[in-house]
């Protein structure tokens, strides 16, 4: 009798653990892709790889807001010392993400660090099956 009770408790515990494991997993490939994309972008920005970061920008956004040589040269003056996600919101049934990030930048020529806020807008492209950035690269000239 005692062993049956222990088996029942064991099964119940396994069911609870399985439910918790599933709750912690992304419910779709799109959600998994979102997490991977945001992490990849964060890593690229942390390493100050601005050309690679530009590859995340949506082509239609680039048509309206092309990245100038001056903007890229300006970004290359800086090394990222910190990248901290302040908030993330998911909208439009998971198709849009707004993320606010504080980025600390060290100016290699002036030996000065500054903090900027990067408001990112990400949208999932169903045809390409990937997340694209619709807000451009961080602006090291911003003042707040």
PLM region spans:
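Bacterial N-terminal signal peptides that target proteins for export
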Residues: 2-13
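C-terminal motif of bacterial Sec signal peptides marking the signal peptidase cleavage site
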Residues: 22-24
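Bacterial signal peptide processing site
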Residues: 26-28
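Short, aromatic-enriched amphipathic alpha-helices that serve as compact interaction elements
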Residues: 30-46, 56
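Short solvent-exposed beta->alpha transition segments
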Residues: 35-36, 50-97, 105, 111
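Exposed beta-sheet edge and beta->alpha loop/turn motif
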Residues: 90-144
């Amino acid at each position: 009798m005692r062993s049956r009770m222990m088996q029942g408790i064991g099964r119940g515990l396994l069911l609870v653990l399985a439910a918790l494991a599933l709750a912690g997993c992304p419910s779709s490939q799109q959600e998994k892709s979102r997490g991977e994309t945001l992490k990849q972008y964060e890593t690229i920005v942390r390493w100050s790889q601005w050309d690679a970061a530009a590859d995340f920008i949506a082509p239609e956004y680039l048509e309206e807001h092309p990245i100038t040589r001056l903007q890229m040269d300006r970004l290359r003056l800086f090394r990222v010392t910190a990248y901290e996600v302040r908030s993330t919101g998911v909208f439009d049934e998971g198709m849009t993400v707004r993320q606010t990030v504080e980025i600390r930048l060290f100016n290699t020529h002036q030996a000065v660090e500054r903090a900027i806020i990067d408001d990112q807008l990400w949208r999932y492209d169903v045809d390409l099956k990937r997340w694209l950035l619709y807000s451009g690269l961080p602006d090291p000239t911003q003042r707040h």
